[in-house]
């Protein structure tokens, strides 16, 4: 009996085991701004304000195009999804065996009753499901260019943290953009970011209040038989 109780306890603990990723922390080195690695100048001209690595043509724009440049991403995400399914099946089966007859064509009786058999079965199934989901994210975040691909596309990455009185709110964004999609104001819409990874969440007591307890997680896990 003790072994059975111990096994049940282990199953409960296994079902309650959390598989969540470690909590997000601020100042993650992976999202730190990238400092461009400019080559050292062989000749240093004292008193000169001109820096060749930062020089722009008279007709060039100021949009991001190099590693370390900053670009503003306008968040405009709005997705809606719905799905429904309805399934219904039915099956009826009937098998009848007429009375068994003898050589003379007369029914064989046992105890005054003829031998005959009848079997019937009926099976019905019906099920329906519906799911609706919508998401909306509006805002802006400034990110930096971390890499320039051979085809001139830009890899961007950045984060924004807002410290509130009951925790922190953060936005993280990574993706690939085309220089042609950047506006003259050095902005781009998030819908034009390829391979975008946009994360908006929070930490602290307010975020923890929305998490399920360990017992609720057990009842929602696959270990719960019902």
Swiss-Prot record:
One of its GO terms (molecular function) is cytoskeletal motor activity. GO terms for cellular component: bacterial-type flagellum basal body, distal rod, L ring; cell outer membrane. It is found in: Cell outer membrane; Bacterial flagellum basal body. A lipid is attached at residue 16 (S-diacylglycerol cysteine). Pfam families: FlgH (PF02107). It is a lipid-anchor. Residues 1-15 form the signal peptide. The keyword NAD does not apply. Keywords: Bacterial flagellum, Cell outer membrane, Lipoprotein, Membrane, Palmitate, Signal. A lipid is attached at residue 16 (N-palmitoyl cysteine). GO terms for biological process: bacterial-type flagellum-dependent cell motility. The keyword Membrane applies. It comes from the Bacteria. Assembles around the rod to form the L-ring and probably protects the motor/basal body from shearing forces during rotation. The basal body constitutes a major portion of the flagellar organelle and consists of four rings (L,P,S, and M) mounted on a central rod. Belongs to the FlgH family. This is Flagellar L-ring protein. It comes from Alteromonas mediterranea (strain DSM 17117 / CIP 110805 / LMG 28347 / Deep ecotype).
